[in-house]
Amino acid sequence: SLRRRFVKEIDRAGYSQLNTMGLVGCQGAYEVGGPWLDELKEYIQGNIQYTLDYFKEHLPKLHMYRPEGTYLMWFDCSELPLTPEEREQWLLNDAKLWLDSGSMFGKDGEKFERINVACPRATLTEGLEALRRAYVAKGF
């Protein structure tokens, strides 16, 4: 059966055994990690608001959506005169950004890109500024 083959492969690879450090880390996270998690969630919410504000001010043809329970944000590129393939090449070659193309989620996602904002603010700012420079250079 598929399950038996899966378990056999897990055992063969050594993943069936608990890692002592991982176990201690997990226990610590559950016992004393609450304040850290609260701070992390607050930080990510700050990044979300920062991204929403940045798009509104600097990238008016790209419409950013507030996420509902995640740190992955979607933005609508339907006002750009680019196919999904052209947009991906523009993002990679001009902005030097590798985002998640919405087309990987099906036809309804073709006009969207997805960005991860669970990172240091400096990293996020660097990426957003690269996107803005490519946006301006393209004349959008």
Task: Please place each PLM-identified region on the residue numbering.
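PLP-dependent class I/II
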Residues: 1-140
